[in-house]
């Protein structure tokens, strides 16, 4: 039995578990699990159901066990701008509001009252997009 490595890719509309292995110097990739993904809406707020996402991650790992291919390591790739706030006991505070939610509308102007757009870019190198984390954080501050 060879060594297996699991990559979990969670995108905005689907997620998948890909097992990788080496055989005769070649990389083999096998999709072992796929699931639907998308934001939920509650009271006009778009958010990620992180509990469901966690359940999907576990389901894909169970699938690896079912087919007898236990990974030695796991890597997870997700979208890069959303976040959850945690309390001192690492419990999630509120919803994991998604980047497509409209709470960031106008938050660029609020951020630029603190730091200019040019200075922000010089410090981060991140292209301006209204869904970037800094605007989500400003929206949280304003709520």
Residue ranges and their predicted role:
Residues 1-95, 122:
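N-terminal glycine/serine-rich phosphate-binding loop of ATP-dependent small-molecule kinases
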Residues 22-23, 141-143:
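Intrinsically disordered, low-complexity boundary segments flanking structured domains
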Residues 84-142:
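Glycine-rich phosphate-binding loop and adjoining helix at the ATP-binding site
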